[in-house]
Amino acid sequence: MASGVTNRNPAFWRQSPFMRTLQTLLFIFLLSPAVLSQNKPLHGIDTSDLDRKVDPCTDFSEFANGTWRAKNPIPASMDRWSKRWQAGETSKGQLKDILEALPAKRAKGSTEQIVGDFYGACMDESRINARGIEPLKPWFAKIDAAKDVAALQPLMAEMHDIQVVVPFVLSSQQDFHKPTQVLADIGANGFNMPDRDYYLKPDDRFREAREKYLDHIAKMFKLVGWDDKSSAAAAQTVMTMETKFAEVSLDRVVLRDPSATDHNSTFAQLHALAPHFDWAEYFRHKQLPQDVDMNVDQPKFMEEFDRQLQQTSLADWKVYLKWNLLNSAAEALPAPIEREDFEFNGKYLSGTSEMKPRWKRCTEQTDRYLGEALGKKYVEKYFPPEAKARMQEMVRNLLMAMRDDILTRPWMSDETKERAMAKIATFNPKIGYPDKWKDYSKVDIRRDVFFETNLASRQFVVEDDRETIGKPVDRGRWGMTPPTSNAYYNPLLNEVVFPAGILQPPAFYVSATDAVNYGAIGVVIGHEISHGFDDQGAQFDYLGRLRNWWSDNDLKQFHERGACVASQFDNYFIEPGIHHNGKLVLGESIGDLGGAKVAFLAYQKSLEGKPRPANIDGFTPEQQFFIAWGQFRGDAIRPEQQRLMVQTDPHPIAKYRVIGPLSNLPEFQKAFQCRPDSPMVRPPDKICEVW
């Protein structure tokens, strides 16, 4: 009899015990009118999003999100979509409401005037179109007036002032060896396509990208009045110069190693790398003394920059600078230029078929350049105090769980554990918004001229950064704006930062069960804390210094465990012939693996001394935890954006951010009663465990 049942539906019996129970429950639920009428989230988990036809032990990402993705196609103006991205779009709508509700009369220099007039100028598309390229002409005229390459160098400094930072960029950076001090950092920035491989690799997709880029450059020059022949020649000039800079630029995997860009230098050493650039005049323009502490990220790049100053013609340098100015300023220029910019960067590279509506583009720009002014208004209206208090408690619990986890690592010596404890003890969490807001009152924001207003706001960003150079580090500064739906870890400050924008569903629910919040925002917290001990963060000690604090054997074991994670992700294919680069995504993957484990431990610890929470909708608290994580990372993504991510992004695509870490966790296997041979259970000899 049993064999007969198996023959009729053999797949049913190969499924996990949990999946068989779930399908039986689903059959009962479908007979219940009460269940049919109930289609709303409960404590943060919307069970209607689950694809119950999929065994969670086979593909947990599809189980957690399959129905939601089927019902929610990616909007035409987005390159990916999920509840998390939906929440980000909700935040933009909230910012729009703030901006459009500002009073008509605003005092000059007030927050309301600064953000309101910037947004209003950006929204005045008819005036932007009517002005045409007139605002760009004075810049082009300055470039045209140069009699030799040396005469272009002061213009490079002026362009750097408005964030047109080519072919190098000067910015602030904490000293890797004295992180209490801020030094001047000279970085490479010689090309505009997403990655050096787009210029150098012979693969068909990269060859096609080069052809599309040439066509795009030519179209952009034609839109500012150049003829077909001149535009095509200019495109080839830009491609030639950018390719030369790409050839000497470090690749993204190498750039993940802090020591690869750690080159503390003097003014004399910088001058020796590029003696044909007038560094004395450049530093004078930037109001920096020549004896300022500095770092040169890529010395070989600076040597190539010097060669190009000698070998590239004046005419070609002029084209290169004009292109970078035009490319950077497209967001503030007439609609045809902005549209062509989208055609290449949005449609071709990322796969989006429509531009975002203008109000979204203008809201994004306001946040990008005037983020703390707008953010102050945002937190006043949308960030409840109880959210910050709940987050502070969760961060404390996650830090304690990370501490306990490290202390139980059998492969670490007591000496290394003690140093790790010092790092845990000095973690500095920042939640919601900065204690002190930036002062934008002197920024010349005008409602009637968007191009100039856009450049004035950019100049503020550059000057605000430059003014920190040569001074003690200000630990109160933030690297993200309050409305940002993201988080980050800074190893030089040993801080984890969670802006207000991420502290909303689906990451965080004030009224949710602990299982849901620990599974979503808890894993995010654990992820950021784990960055302090990933392949990059582990190179910095508790004071933020780039210094080895590991014993030789412990470091060897750590690298071996990291290699396991890299190998796992090397084998995740996006499409035939294209797979993740495990070394590129190693840090984020260690963060996801450590974050999921530590958050689960913290959740378990939070239950000590309390009655066991009840099941909800047939799901145990442990299952709710993992579903919350799966749904937080439940992105749908366009193929073009997926290819771009695999090439350039240190984050794996969302599917593998769910499947990858969970398939290593016995806690997940136990929660869903997965068979040992299930796809979501890695073989014992393949399990990766770092933390």
Model-derived features with residue positions:
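Hydrophobic/aromatic-rich, well-ordered segments within soluble, folded domains that form packed cores
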Residues: D49-A70, Y199, D203-K222, L586, ...
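Sec-dependent signal peptide recognition
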Residues: R20-F27
